[in-house]
Design a protein with these regions (language model features):
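Conserved N-terminal entry element of GNAT/NAT acetyltransferase domains
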Residues: 1-25
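Short coil/turn motifs at secondary-structure junctions
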Residues: 77-79, 98, 131
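A short, internal acetyl-CoA/4′-phosphopantetheine-binding micro-motif in the GNAT/acyltransferase core
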Residues: 90-101, 129
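Conserved acetyl-CoA-binding loop-helix of GNAT-fold acetyltransferases
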Residues: 95, 101-114
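Conserved active-site alpha-helix within GNAT-family acetyltransferase domains
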Residues: 118-123, 128-155
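C-terminal "cap" of GNAT-fold acetyltransferases
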Residues: 149-173
Length: 173
């Protein structure tokens, strides 16, 4: 793992509604590189194609010489809480293996976190297997009980598959 900062890195936000097939292909390639499990590949392809219908999703892409090396998606998604409705979800955060440790993930996530506070982007709520990374950027773990309103058969089932659910900013109460 190289420690330092990736050179010639270009970070851009693209509205999902206008993502080209070429860029989407790069996103799918990076998702599969990050999560290579066979069963998960098929599920990820389906989810990626299904997400194409979501006109309010944005993709933050980190490029080096026209190669996608980092990615995150975010979208306004309403979540009802005891204190009212909050909105924003972060998903599909990944960095290609040889660029890990070079500030690519940090730059992508800082770009997304900078959007918090904009209309319909109250907080960033997400799941992760690497909570320490996000804690350094101002997020914290939450232990709230979640009810999955889209799962009519078992709404009490945990809607998250990763162990840690986090929220940004860490001051959100």
């Amino acid at each position: 793992m190289k420690i330092g900062e990736a050179k010639n890195l270009k970070v851009q936000c693209i509205a999902h509604a206008v993502v080209s097939d070429e860029v989407l292909g790069e996103v799918v390639r990076l998702l599969h590189e990050t999560w290579p499990e066979i069963e998960y590949k098929q599920q990820r392809i389906f989810q990626t194609i299904k997400a194409m219908e979501d006109r309010q999703k944005y993709r933050v892409c980190a490029w080096q010489n026209q190669r996608l090396v980092g990615h995150a998606a975010f979208l306004p998604r309403s979540i009802d809480t005891n204190r009212g409705r909050i909105s924003m979800q972060l998903a599909a955060v990944c960095v290609t293996l040889e660029f890990r440790g070079q500030q690519v993930g940090r730059r992508v996530i800082e770009w997304v976190f900078d959007q918090v506070g904009q209309p319909r982007l109250d907080v960033a709520l997400f799941q992760t297997g690497v909570p320490g990374f996000y804690e350094k950027l101002g997020a914290r773990c939450v232990s709230n009980r979640f009810v999955n309103s889209t799962n009519t058969e078992a709404p009490e089932a945990n809607p998250w598959w990763d162990e840690h659910v986090m929220i940004f900013p860490d001051t959100y109460d």
